[in-house]
Amino acid sequence: MNKIYQEALDALNNHQVIAFPTETVFGLGVFYDDQKAYELLNAVKRRREDKPYTMMLSKVEDIFKYADVDDKYLKVIKKYMPGSLTILVKSKDNVPGYVTHNTGIIGIRIPSNKEALELLAFVKKPLLVPSANRADQIPALTSEEVVAIFGDEIKVVVHGQIQSGEPSIIIDITGPEMKLVRKGPIPFEELNH
């Protein structure tokens, strides 16, 4: 697999969009601090620029490099990450304003999919990762679907299997109370008890 990860890293370093499996759906990825690639990602997705992308990391301890998290949420983070959980948190100054749409809030996820984790560890930098689909369309569940949707707009596709096909649950932990933003495979009640 290292060969495909190297190809993915080369593409990312050249401001290109890659695709890879997560445990939920296939995702598209660019380096979080590459504005040129970010703009290309918006074009590929045909997405309005008012919805921030999730930032994917390879390990829990990396969250604290990019976000400020209230200690009371650490138990939930350590129990459910990696996994189908996206947390909305206050970003640190090293996260570019265009990533958060100047809100100072970023969605962070650590996937549990083997290929996704290996890729993230290999490239050694967070990726902005929306689902692999055009705006308002169904996300790709296989590498073949990624190619059918995007053709040569995606330079490297990492092959692998998704697990569920259901997008991650999103919770907002920027304030004193945990808030549900989007339902997902993990019941909110399980997180918020």
What are these regions (language model features)?
Residues 1-193:
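Active-site-adjacent structural elements in enzyme catalytic cores
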